[in-house]
Amino acid sequence: MPVVKGGVWTNIEDEVLRAAVSKYGLNQWARVSSLLARKTPKQCKARWVEWLDPGIRKVEWSREEDEKLLHLAKLMPTQWRTIAPIVGRTATQCLERYQKLLDEAEARENDELGLGGPSGGEAAAPSADDVRRLRPGELDPDPESKPARPDTIDLDEDEKEMLSEARARLANTQGKKAKRKARERQLEESRRLAVLQKRRELKNAGINIKVVTRKKGEMDYNADIPFEKPAAPGFYDTTEEEARNERQREMFDPRKQQLANKRKGDQEEDADRKKRKNDKNGSSAFAAAARAGQMQKIREAEQSSKRRALVLPAPQVSESEMEDIIKMGMAGDRASKMSGDDETTRGLIGNYTSIVGGTPIRTPRAPPEEDHIANEIRNIRALTETQSSLLGGENTPLHEGGSSTGFDGIAPRRQQIVTPNPMATPFRQANGLGATPLHGGIGPGATPLRTPRDQFALNQMEGGQLIGTTPRDIRLHQKAVSQAIRSKLASLPKPKETEWELEELPSESAEPTVAAEISEEDAAERDRREREARERAAQAELKRQTQVYQRGLPRPSVLDIDALMARASQVTDPINGMIAKEAALLIANDAQKFRLPNGKVEGKARKLERLNDELIEAARAAIVAEVASSNQQQEWLQGFDDRWSSTHSNALPGLANYGDDDEDENMYRQEQRMIDAFENVQASLLATAERGNKLEKKLALHYGGYQNRAKTLRTKIVEASSALENSKYELNAFQTLQISEESAISRRLEKLRDDVAFVLKREREAQETYRIRKEELDELVAGTEAVVNGWH
């Protein structure tokens, strides 16, 4: 029964194929397939090319690769074998990625238009993956590009036999055939050297013989040129051909050719082979396993991309120099702070801190660009779904120009975003391009080359002296500077008589208080001092607040400040009125300043005047002193007893607060009427809202399709108007081009006619000259023959 070869690849078959390729190379696929009982040579080659080759990239696709794939698919449709090496993937990977991009675009468009149908369950529409997934009973048409199937625990008999045979054949590197081939190569080389030596000796003896070693139907590649195409007789310019041949000759390396002809498996030493054969212990197996693991690591390292170490130039400023610069800057800041209070010293010290340049610090953002990948996918789907050209109509609108990858070359078009380099373009500053250079050769708005912060113009010409200056120019410049300084000093006003009073200098025995002030304070001490100062300020601010806030007593959550202030102003007693107003003002300020989580405050109170802490303490002391007096305490007790007796004299507490019953009944009825009206209005609002929701759903059901259609038509109208505008621009451009070409055609024709007439004239003159010379030659030949015949 014949065996049908093919099917899913297993891990064992992949490992055997790798080992066979490492031994037999990439050209002897028949030998490689002889180790795999279930695979043909074509399938072995496809498996290596599509999956096992270390050069295959199996990582996720990047955006640049997707853009390049769609661009090449637009240039070379369905030519996946040509596109694959350009993209750096296999043809199967390119095709699968291309189909996946189209499927994702289609699914995204369906989701946007709401055509997905009910979600979930069997009612959902099948996706592209569901359509391409194999069903039970179907065979994978391309198993070479799929991952290997895990090995089973119990192998079949044919699999065990295949594995044992592959192990035996791959381990046999010292077989009879290998020895015979090596011996034949050595004999062939010695025979060739003997023939060359014999020919050299005969040539030295004066006998030249021709070495003919080829058989019938063969070619001697040392003497003949294979595939030679002799050039036609005549005179031709062969400069370009000679240069091309010279480049090809330089590129040819005979050593690589010899290495390609050799087999990859090198013969090992006989001593090592005998040692492995005689070693029956477990150490040989352990060493072989370790060696195999090491070789596997080497292969994996070769398969992975080699990353070179990042080589950076040496820093221009060392760490010590950077520390010196920082110390100099700190010293300058300290001196500026010390001299900041004195007007006289402040004018003599400039600000040498860092200055931010005109160029932006952050990298400029990239300009908004269109999604080239999405536009190319839309173009492909539009070209695929378009109707036949026989039906007529307008062409399919496509994304062209800057919104697509274009047709400029094999690589997609992209806009290069380059970060501006202020060192490469020093004249392109914020004050304008092409400005007039400053005096001294320095660019517009640029800082001097060596002193970027020169406020007193001490090194104004230093940048110009670095380039193109001579000693004479330097002397003239110094002389001009000295004269300018003298003229400025001469223009100063004359000194006035002024009396100065100088303070006495401190004695040497005095304590160095200045040095103590100048010395820096420890950071921990400074932080502790600032924290204590903040705590003292917080305690003082807390003592300035009311006792209600300090003790955390309950406060009103809902407060109407205007009503509270109005009730306080209605108090007739002037003293109690002042107290009531002040209390109302304190309550309002506490409610506004320290709001409760769910509190509600209406109105706005005037801001409290901030009193001095000494006045507050004096007032509190006066209150305590007044309360401490016994007479005041007795009066308070007597007033409390009177108030208690008057309050509890009635039968029911608070009965005096109730008014007339008729008035209360009228107010109750009015309140009930308002509640009923409110409930009726609320019920009407709910019914109206429910009826409106029903009408909205009904209208959406009936007119939803029309709305979508109107939206689509509106979009098409906008696109058609833009296309019409572009067509008008193109028509005007082509009309202008036609007019210019028509005017140029006449001039070109006239010039060509003049050239043809000149060529015809020169040709006639040449023919006439040739005829005259030919007649003279014939006469000379005839005269020579007559003389010769006369002698005979």
Swiss-Prot record:
Residues 705-780 form a coiled coil. Keywords: Coiled coil, Cytoplasm, DNA-binding, mRNA processing, mRNA splicing, Nucleus, Repeat, Spliceosome. Residues 507-517 have a biased composition (Low complexity). InterPro entries: CDC5L/Cef1 (IPR047242), Cdc5p/Cef1_C (IPR021786), Homeodomain-like_sf (IPR009057), Myb_dom (IPR017930), SANT/Myb (IPR001005), SANT_CDC5L_II (IPR047240). Pfam families: Myb_Cef, Myb_DNA-bind_6. The keyword Cell division does not apply. Residues 129-152, 241-256, 525-536 have a biased composition (Basic and acidic residues). GO terms for cellular component: cytosol; nucleolar peripheral inclusion body; post-mRNA release spliceosomal complex; Prp19 complex; spliceosomal complex. Its main location: cytoplasm. Residues 1-56, 57-106 form the HTH myb-type domain. Residues 111-189, 224-307, 389-410, 490-536 are annotated as: Disordered. GO terms for molecular function: DNA binding. One of its GO terms (biological process) is mRNA cis splicing, via spliceosome. Involved in pre-mRNA splicing and cell cycle control. Belongs to the CEF1 family. Associated with the spliceosome. This is Pre-mRNA-splicing factor cef1. It comes from Aspergillus fumigatus (strain ATCC MYA-4609 / CBS 101355 / FGSC A1100 / Af293). The lineage of its organism: Eukaryota, Fungi, Dikarya, Ascomycota, Pezizomycotina.
